[in-house]
């Protein structure tokens, strides 16, 4: 209401875990929505996708998404605390997402050792200013326990 020209867009991909349906939505004042409706296709998404989106955005769907996000945040906080105890962790960047970016004393060694164990991480070694950095996605409790078991066994 405060900004007549503001449009907020959101995707159902990440938080709602619906990347495959390729659907999002816009929130704006009524006049902007009316203008948008004049230029979009009459049927911009197929019926099955619309039905899934309606379910995801229902009270129950939103509540489930909030619960998943809270649990992900809890697992991220635990992982961060566990990583801080490792002697070869130099820095953990602030994160509000479903991952942690971690600077290790030897990022490539950590990345390669985890890859040999079948743990998929993402190296940021070649990104400017992120030498020795590895991104760790927040998985299930069991996956994170396995990751920590492997990391604790490393000799770096």
Regions found by a protein language model. Give the residues of each.
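PLP-dependent enzyme catalytic core of the Aspartate aminotransferase-like
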Residues: 116-117, 126-156
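PLP-dependent aminotransferase class I/II
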Residues: 5-83
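Short acidic/glycine-enriched loop/turn segments that link adjacent beta-strands
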Residues: 20, 96-97, 128-132
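A short linear hydrophobic-aromatic micro-motif
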Residues: 8, 87-91, 119-125
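Conserved PLP-binding catalytic core of the aspartate aminotransferase-like
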Residues: 72-73, 83-117
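Short beta-strand-to-loop capping motifs
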Residues: 28, 102-105, 138-140
